[in-house]
């Protein structure tokens, strides 16, 4: 529908203009920043009008229609709370299988983690099609272009495609919590959950390897973090503990 096109395009106009405003701020280009912020505000107002005039509804089972405005932050407080609940209902109605497309699949786990980390793990652990774990369960060693991998007629789609591989960003940045915040600075904020017994990831920086691993224990979780030379890491654990550390190996 035309309103769907307007909604999708307007959402990404907001996203891109606000990203450009942030870049301009970092570069000290205040005139550009003000221009981008002004146009982003206008686009936000236009998106809000589409919702409030009910030209499109957030009472929907279409996961992308809920994920996109939640991720970009386009809804007011009341609408946001409703959209979160409606997204969980939409996933329940689809047996916790992915129903997002090319644009929203990279966003859905982050949106769910903001609601409750266990929702994100529940979706990640789905082994039915459409779902990430359906691929390795059926012999995949790469990310398929199509969820089913092989077509019903016997044809094979691309077996090496990025569109659904954006899940790796969530595995590194949320599950294992490795986030680069500067040339030699990191934020380490692992968020374990689901039925996983352990997870580990590493990032090869110009100063050496940043390594994070967590293991499930009888009493909770234990963490092992290795920070490379000449680097600093702000460690934030799920129980609220925070610590800024330099190079070295740490266990919590």
Identify what each model region corresponds to.
Residues 24-26, 31, 248-252:
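Acidic/polar, glycine-enriched structural segments that form the non-catalytic walls/loops
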């Amino acid at each position: 529908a035309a309103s769907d096109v307007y909604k999708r395009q307007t959402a990404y106009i907001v996203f891109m203009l606000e990203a450009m405003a942030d870049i301009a701020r970092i570069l000290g280009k205040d005139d550009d920043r003000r221009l981008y912020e002004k146009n982003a505000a206008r686009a936000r107002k236009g998106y809000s009008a589409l919702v409030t005039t009910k030209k499109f509804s957030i009472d929907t089972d279409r996961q992308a229609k809920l994920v996109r405005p939640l991720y970009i932050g386009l809804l007011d407080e009341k609408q946001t709370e409703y959209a979160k609940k409606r997204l969980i209902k939409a996933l329940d109605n689809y047996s916790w299988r992915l129903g997002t497309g090319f644009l929203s699949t990279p966003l859905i786990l982050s949106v769910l983690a903001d609601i409750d980390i266990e929702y994100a793990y529940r979706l990640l652990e789905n082994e039915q099609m459409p779902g990430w774990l359906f691929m390795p369960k059926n012999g995949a060693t790469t990310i398929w272009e199509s969820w089913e991998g092989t077509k019903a007629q016997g044809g094979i789609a691309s077996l090496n495609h990025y569109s659904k591989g954006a899940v790796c960003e969530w595995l590194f940045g949320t599950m294992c919590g490795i986030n680069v915040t500067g040339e030699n600075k990191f934020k380490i904020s692992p968020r374990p959950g689901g039925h996983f017994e352990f997870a580990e990831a590493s990032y090869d920086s110009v100063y050496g390897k940043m390594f994070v691993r967590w293991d499930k224990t009888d009493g909770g979780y234990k963490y092992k973090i290795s920070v490379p030379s000449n680097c600093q890491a702000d460690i934030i654990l799920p129980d609220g503990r925070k610590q800024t550390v330099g190079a070295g190996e740490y266990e919590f």
